[in-house]
Amino acid sequence: MIKKYEYDLCGKKIEVTIGKVAEQANGACLIQSGETVLLVTAVGSKEPREGVDFFPLTCDFEEKLYSVGKIPGGFIKREGRPSEKATLTARLIDRPLRPLFPEGYHNDVQVIATALSVDQDNTPDILAMIGSSIALSISDIPFLGPTGSVAVGMIDGEFIINPTKEQREKSDLELTVAGTKDAIMMVEAGCNNITEQQVLKAILRAHEEIKKICEFIESIQKECGKPKQEFIQPEKNIELDEEVKSFCIEDLKKITVNEDKLDREDHINTLKRSVVDYFVEKYDESIASKVSTIYDDLEKSEVRRLILEDYIRPDNRKLDQIREITCDVDILPRPHGSGLFKRGQTQVLSVTTLGTPSDAQVLDGLIEQEDKRYMHQYNFPPYSVGDARPLRSPGRREIGHGALAERALLPVIPSEEEFPYTIRVVSEVLSSNGSSSQASVCGSTLSLLDAGVPIKEPVAGIAMGLIKEDDNVVILSDIQGLEDHLGDMDFKVAGTKDGITALQMDIKITGISEEILTEALERARVGRLHILSLMNECISEPNKEISKYAPRIMVINIAPEKVREVIGPGGKVINKIIDETGVKIDTEDDGKITVAGENTESAQRAIDMIKEIVREPEIGEKYLGRVTKIMNFGAFVEILPGKEGLLHISNIAHERTNKVEDVLKENDEIMVKLMDIDDQGKMTLSRKALLPKPERKEKKNFDKKSEDQNSEDK
């Protein structure tokens, strides 16, 4: 049976259709707003996956170019690997759902959101998140939702729920929030340097709408929902738990706190092997995995107990203490800018490259095509955590971390008018013990300043953590890897001294309160200011000069109708400039021309040549022209690139010229004067006007003849 539901989200109608498509999926729905339509499905396996100790959830977002009336490029004309935007949307779907499955549930679950039709005002990401919650809620998969999701913009201090394309372009905030009726589950934001109070108000405003969306989904679930699969958590062997605990807990307590990550891991793993070996010998091999799991749970419990009860962190820091920080710049000779940022045992090298406008990344997917002139990419090689494994292309984590750091710096990147370069920053994680994405924010700032990029303000990032047991809550500043792994929250905040530029929150519990959010934001602000002060001691302002290896860019604006003259037929004119000067030239339809050369001299020479091309001839001006063609009646002379005038045979010299070839030949350079331009733009030139007038010998000869004649008469 097909059922349709409608929901009004702040003036925008959302339509949900159940039972029309994908009937073999555990749960499926069509969700529509405006002309954006998505199919969202949820499928779960009937049995748990063998040999895993994690929840195998996969969320995918499929961009179909037919949804915007496009045909894929390339030879095969088929959608390829997911775009960066699709990957980020898949992460948005995944993050609020993952904590809402029963502990110990190891069945495979796959959620797929497919964009079938997309308009520019109703972005598919929010619909995909809501549709995923609906598909899981009406399925028989044991999902503990529902969740709701909204986007929030801010224009002139006013919050806008699910802003349109035009509103997004004007907004100082790009916030995505997901949560349940009771708590916030996920936050993702890019901000134009706004305050913590404004961010918090926006999150709370979003949660008001999320509660209503959850109620809407619950009403659908009541009518269409399937009975949930019965999931019984595996019974614990209490006796074995106690036996393992009594055998190793005292030794575990002694080695839990250690400032050195690798040394701590060595001790923890050595003890674990001895514990497993002891019980395998005592019982049999089949018990090994159970003992290993019990040991891991003991380690987690001990770390959390120390923090909650004794306020002792695994590396012996105070709760709000930030690890030791070192900064360095200009460490690589050839790249255009470089910065090395180290916080504890996390170290990131960020490298900046300055390019021309044509180096900008062209984004052409479900959104309108646009150029991206600031790019940040994040790499996490295996050696950064002491692993030996094959190198692969960037995964979802790398793409997500790179996008977060990019978003953090974007508000301070100068406009193209101020700084006409394309900017690419690559952050290489050299060593990781947590907060590497925020270290890449700090490293990027150092690198950009070293490259001479006039960023508006330095940006720093910090990751906050949370340990929560019932009402006992502890917030941690600058979390390391273990605290991220065993804690309940990873809350990343980046910004300047004045406000927030990017935010990302992921939690592993069923939500956090307003009070926790408020305290976490304030603690992050204090930590961020501390980090910025240390970075400023290393470099506080952009270098006055860009690298000698960076291209020199000059910009000239000409009349739009003159662009074709600069390009010339088949690119003949522009290619000649490029060949003669060795520069790179980018033209735009609005008349903006960007010239990039290896040095200032070559770029300036190209600019001068362009000026000559677009220069308008003026009557009465003198020009050094080149003879392009000889005719019986005169010669055509090019006085400016692409601009020829007629030098009539009578205007070549004061004396009579019998044949043009007697005085001129092709490619001769001569000085001429522009005498006239007729209504059709044809130019009349004169060489004669610039030549000195000869003495009138004819008159002298006449006088002499007269004298001779008079003498004869006498």
Swiss-Prot record:
This is Polyribonucleotide nucleotidyltransferase. NCBIfam families: polynuc_phos, PRK11824.1. Pfam families: KH_1, PNPase, RNase_PH, RNase_PH_C, S1. Coiled coil: none annotated. Involved in mRNA degradation. Catalyzes the phosphorolysis of single-stranded polyribonucleotides processively in the 3'- to 5'-direction. The gene is pnp. Its main location: cytoplasm. Keywords: Cytoplasm, Magnesium, Metal-binding, Nucleotidyltransferase, RNA-binding, Transferase. SMART domains: KH, S1. Its EC number is 2.7.7.8. Signal peptide: none annotated. One of its GO terms (biological process) is mRNA catabolic process. Residues 693-714 have a biased composition (Basic and acidic residues).
